Amino acid sequence: MLLVFDVGNTNIVMGIYKGKKLLHSFRISTEKSKTSDEYGMLINQLFEYNGLKLKDVDAVIISSVVPPIMHTLESMTIKYCNTKPLIVGPGIKTGINIKYDNPKEVGADRIVNAVAAYEIYGGPVIVIDFGTATTFCAISKNCEYLGGIIAPGLAISADALFQRTAKLPKIELTKPSTVICKNTVSSMQSGIIYGHVGMVDYIVSRMKEEFAPNAYVVATGGFARMIAEESKTINTVNDMLTLEGLRIIYERNAD
């Protein structure tokens, strides 16, 4: 079995593959203070709950935007899976030509998403990932990573309002039924969520003007479905895009 890790600033998402089939996926909190043994015990419990054995994992791939966690998980997989993981980074085969000024600056998660989106949907394609940050990536019809945009995510926006104002409360990110709201909490929710929808649609329209009017737009990440319900530019949501990208990259490097 192949175990894939997508390590983000807020969550770690894991997928277990048998061949090309995703058997299970899990989401746990990203905690820098956890040791490799603590992660090993937690992941082992998730496996056992789903009738699986961690020792049956014979391959691992890790994509991480949090370097300390990457090293912790690397130690964990060596000890508990008896296998050295493939790390998404410089030198691995992705099949994508990165046109960034400095290709090493591109986050591993963005590369993984680009690989999956091009493999599944073809190009040109735009990938929007709604995570801690909201990122946009442009991939050409020739499988070139042209660049993109990094914007504050919804949770960051909500936290900023709470932390930088004297009277505004901490809120849950749920979508109000109307844009015009009659209380503070729903007014904040409206501004953050519908404001994000407006940002997404404007940025996508500008991206299409600059590189491909016919680009297909795929969204992923925790808030993707909520934003896609209101967006006029998102064509589809793929919750497992990053996990699929990790599987594809592993297969390209397995030989």
UniProtKB/Swiss-Prot annotation:
ATP binds at D6, V7, G8, N9, T10, N11, I12, V13, T132. Pathway: Cofactor biosynthesis; coenzyme A biosynthesis; CoA from (R)-pantothenate: step 1/5. Substrate binds at Y100, G107, A108, D109, R110, T184. A monovalent cation. Ammonium or potassium. Its main location: cytoplasm. InterPro entries: ATPase_NBD (IPR043129), Type_III_PanK (IPR004619). GO terms for molecular function: ATP binding; metal ion binding; pantothenate kinase activity. Keywords: ATP-binding, Coenzyme A biosynthesis, Cytoplasm, Kinase, Metal-binding, Nucleotide-binding, Potassium, Transferase. NCBIfam families: baf, PRK13318.1-5, PRK13318.1-6, PRK13321.1. This is Type III pantothenate kinase. It comes from Thermoanaerobacter pseudethanolicus (strain ATCC 33223 / 39E) (Clostridium thermohydrosulfuricum). The lineage of its organism: Bacteria, Bacillati, Bacillota, Clostridia, Thermoanaerobacterales. The gene is coaX.
